[in-house]
Regions:
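N-terminal helix-cap/turn-to-beta initiation motif at the start of protein domains
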Residues: 22-39, 131
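An anionic, turn-rich surface loop/hairpin at beta-sheet edges
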Residues: 82-99
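Bacterial signal peptide processing site
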Residues: 17-19
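C-terminal motif of bacterial Sec signal peptides marking the signal peptidase cleavage site
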Residues: 12-15
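A composition-driven surface/loop motif
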Residues: 30, 63-69, 123, 129
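N-terminal glycine/threonine-rich, aromatic-flanked beta-hairpin/loop signature
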Residues: 24, 40-87
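Sec-dependent signal peptide recognition
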Residues: 2-8
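C-terminal partner/receptor-binding element of secreted or periplasmic proteins
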Residues: 108-136
Length: 136
């Protein structure tokens, strides 16, 4: 038990965020400027191919959908977490990504996304399948 407390304190002090239980994460509503549809534009080194597309959908309630597509669609639901004034996207797979927004640009997981009016058709289908409210 002591080891866990020490490890937790070390992680907190080092600036790393770790999540061991998705259900225990408190979902935080999205600030007005963060809610909406975000999508990569052009090739990015963090994606598997120059043709790959990355999208992040953020609902006003704080639900997220990390949607990556190339030869198939991989969509992982998640939620926004606020820690020390910084927003993170925590996925159901326990991946934790810091969100850095500058106007209509959002950086996370080594990707640069731009605000868009609507998601791709494939990500919209994944959003509906996940049962998330996409109203922004």
């Amino acid at each position: 038990m002591k080891k866990r407390m020490i490890l937790g304190a070390m992680l907190l002090l080092s600036g790393c965020v770790q999540v061991d239980n998705y259900q225990a994460v408190v979902k935080h509503p999205a600030p007005a400027g963060l809610a909406g549809y975000w999508q990569s534009t052009g090739p990015q080194s963090s994606l598997v191919s120059p043709e790959a597309i990355a999208s992040l959908i953020v609902t006003p309630q704080g639900d997220t959908l990390d949607c990556r597509q190339w030869q198939r669609v991989i969509a992982v639901p998640g939620k926004l977490m606020l820690d020390g004034g910084t927003f993170y996207n925590v996925t159901q797979k326990l991946d934790v990504y810091r969100l850095n927004q500058q106007g209509n640009t959002l950086e996370f997981d080594g990707l640069t996304l731009s605000r868009t009016d609507k998601p791709t058709v494939e990500c919209q289908q994944a959003l509906e399948k996940a049962g998330l409210d996409s109203k922004r």
